[in-house]
Amino acid sequence: MNKCIAFHSYKGGTGKSTLACNSAILLARKGYRVCLLDLDIYAPSFHLYFSKEPRKWINDFLTSSANIQDVMIDVTDSFNSQQRHTDSIKSNDHVGEKEVEISGKLWVGLSNPQKKEIFKLETADTNTKRQAIRRFIHLRELLMSDFKADYIIVDTSPGIRFWSINSLAIADILLLTLKMSDLDIDGTRIVAEEIYRCFIELGSKAYLVYNMVEGYCVPRQTISNKEEISNISGSTIAQKPRNDIASVTQLLSQQRSDDDDWPSSLSTDLGIEIISFIPCYCDIQFLRKEFLTVLKYKDHPFTFQIEKLIDAL
């Protein structure tokens, strides 16, 4: 059964783009035909992730000035050839784990990052926007028919905006992504009550995805008794004494206890099931290509979390 899954959030910074990319890549790795769409019209990022420039952008398709074949880029072979080269190097060095090739197909559709193109969509007249809504629906239909897509993964703009709402309208499954902060919680309530309720009534399924949850990363133990150590630039960095580490650990434990109840309470209040708790993996946040984690590090805990999320869907 074909599925269209949209990653959305009340505000930016919840990691939805990373989750969307890794979910799409993992599905393709499993042998599925996957189309990944950057429908974050206001702040697109996939062109940087994949270092690709298409013949035509999604913006062009929405304004009826491009066909879908000119928009979608097949990135399967480029990933696999890159991995074979990397595996060869690792094999010679006898270190690291080999990356896993994509056995399915992965296409990417990119939004134009240029200011004038974003402004053109944002300031379009009512008739143009009405036509664009039809094009959104047609986009989904073409990906299902022409590309035989098993899955369409959509990264949307955060918040309650015209283009983000219409991105959600083409999805069967809505993943409302949030972090464990008051701003995310309050904003998620607004989005769920004002937007998601309508989509659920029309047959869409919605779930809460808690991302960057505390519990994986722990404070690094001090490696020296010295109060200061030199960093790379030669300047000094003050080190926390060991009893400070204990205090931080105790504080984290207290925070965890205080936060134990509200995730389930929010789920109950909104009538939206929690589908995943994904810890904050500090090492991933500092990767230059965190969107490739499931491909490059198949045994990483984050990869298992994405596996669980996909299985739950």
Which ranges hold each PLM region?
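Walker A/P-loop phosphate-binding motif and the immediately C-terminal alpha-helix
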Residues: 2-42
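Hydrophobic/aromatic beta-strand patches that form the interior of the parallel beta-sheet core
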Residues: 5, 37, 107-109, 173-175, ...
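Short amphipathic alpha-helical segment that frequently serves as the phosphate-/nucleotide-binding helix
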Residues: 17-22, 185, 189, 303
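Conserved catalytic-core segment of NTP-binding enzymes
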Residues: 29, 134-275
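Short, ordered loop/turn segments at secondary-structure junctions
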Residues: 39-42, 113, 158, 179-180, ...
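P-loop/Walker-type NTP enzyme "switch/lid" segment
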Residues: 41-144, 285-292
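Short, hinge-like loop/turn segments at secondary-structure boundaries
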Residues: 52-56, 194-195, 224-227, 293-295
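Conserved GTP-binding G-domain of TRAFAC-class P-loop NTPases and closely related GTPase folds
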Residues: 259-260, 275, 280-312
